[in-house]
Curated annotation (Swiss-Prot):
Disulfide bonds: none
Protein name as it appears in the record: tRNA dimethylallyltransferase
Keyword tags: ATP-binding, Magnesium, Nucleotide-binding, Transferase, tRNA processing
Reaction(s) this enzyme catalyzes, per UniProt: adenosine(37) in tRNA + dimethylallyl diphosphate = N(6)-dimethylallyladenosine(37) in tRNA + diphosphate
Cofactors, names only: Mg(2+)
Residue segments, region Interaction with substrate tRNA: 42-45, 166-170
Family statement drawn from the similarity comment of this UniProt entry: Belongs to the IPP transferase family.
Organism: Gluconacetobacter diazotrophicus (strain ATCC 49037 / DSM 5601 / CCUG 37298 / CIP 103539 / LMG 7603 / PAl5)
Database matches in Pfam families: IPPT (PF01715)
Residues that, per the record, bind substrate: 19-24
Binding site for ATP: 17-24
GO biological process: tRNA modification
Length: 332
């Protein structure tokens, strides 16, 4: 079998869009229609400590159809792009082997791009280098660590903002643990794109609709136990630079629990921060193709609100996906 023919028989569906656009609900509708396995492509939904604040699928949804890579990491770890790619490829291949259709669902563009465009294969720096990077960020701050990095690896440092603690720490641990910087590894080692037939549905609701939905959802999260979720995180004494500690709502609710903000102030700040993030997500997805033009559908509304409109959107998305899968199997 040729590579092109093999790819036609290996469909991967992609459901992407900004936070709170209704991706999970659409993924469930599609999974019912295509006997699908939903594979998480959200960098915060990988953390088991953050079911509420990351709006992970409900236990009922997880029982109805297979969900993979949700809640699989403790908050003490980092779900890097390379880690996710390796796990996602394994889950996609397992779905194919079981006769199911894999459905990537999420809003983390760099995760999705690791499959569509490939990824630099950087060696594991090791636990000592990771611990050193976290210690330096916590003790000195990201700007000071950025200065250290610039002295030994100026090329990698030049590509990073000094305040980006996560990426600065990652660059330091790579240099410290491998003896080469990020820029070096990006030039020398690459994992190829996944050989498959991609069909993508991107949700792109109006920003005012999204802002209103974010506010409603965050209020529901607070009522549903988000404060207890953050309280449990704080009890672990985790470094603030860890990704889980920077998830939407965590810093703001943590400030409230410390007495630095009222609950209304924390809620307002969290909603604003999430809204700013969704703008960046929408911009990113508008400039990065997840599938070919004929295999891509953009839906300009949120999957929520009016029930009849939502059902029409579900039907349109499922019809498009089934048609493109069928076309892909007939033609190269």
């Amino acid at each position: 079998m040729t590579q092109a023919a093999d790819a036609r028989d290996r469909p991967v569906l992609v459901i992407a869009g900004p936070t709170c656009s209704g991706k999970s609900a659409l993924a469930m509708a599609v999974a019912r229609a295509v006997d699908g396995t939903i594979v998480n492509a959200d960098s915060m939904q990988v953390y088991r400590d953050l079911r509420i604040l990351t709006a992970r699928p409900t236990p009922a949804d997880e029982a109805e159809c297979p969900h993979r890579l949700y809640g699989v990491l403790p908050a003490t770890e980092t779900g890097s792009v390379a880690w996710w790619r390796g796990r996602a490829v394994a889950e996609i291949e397992a779905a194919w082997a079981a006769g199911r259709t894999p459905i990537l669902c999420g809003g983390t563009g760099m995760y999705l791009r690791a499959l569509t465009d490939g990824l630099t294969d950087i060696p594991d720096p090791g636990p000592e280098a990771r611990a050193e990077a976290r210690r330096l960020v916590d003790a000195e701050g990201p700007a000071a660590l950025h200065d250290r990095l610039a002295a030994v690896d100026p090329e990698s440092a030049a590509a990073l903002h000094p305040a980006d603690s996560q990426r600065v720490a990652r660059a330091w641990e790579v240099w410290s643990g491998t003896g080469h910087g990020m820029a070096h590894w990006r030039r020398t080692a690459t994992l190829p794109p996944l050989a498959c037939r991609r069909v993508a549905v991107r949700l792109d609701p109006p920003r005012d609709t999204l802002r209103a939905a974010i506010a409603v959802r965050f209020a529901a999260m607070v009522q549903g136990g988000a404060l207890d979720e953050v309280r449990a995180l704080l009890a672990q004494g985790l470094p603030p630079a860890l990704p889980a500690m920077r998830a939407h709502g965590v810093p703001e609710l943590a400030a409230h629990l410390r007495g630095d903000l009222t609950l209304d102030e924390a809620t307002h700040r969290a909603v604003l921060a999430t809204g700013r993030y969704t703008r960046r997500q929408s911009t990113w997805f508008a400039h990065h193709d997840l599938a070919g033009p004929a295999d891509s559908l953009v839906i300009g509304t949120r999957m929520g609100g009016d029930a009849q409109q939502m059902e029409r959107n579900y039907a349109d998305a499922v019809s498009f996906i089934l048609m493109r899968i069928d076309v892909g199997r007939q033609f190269p």
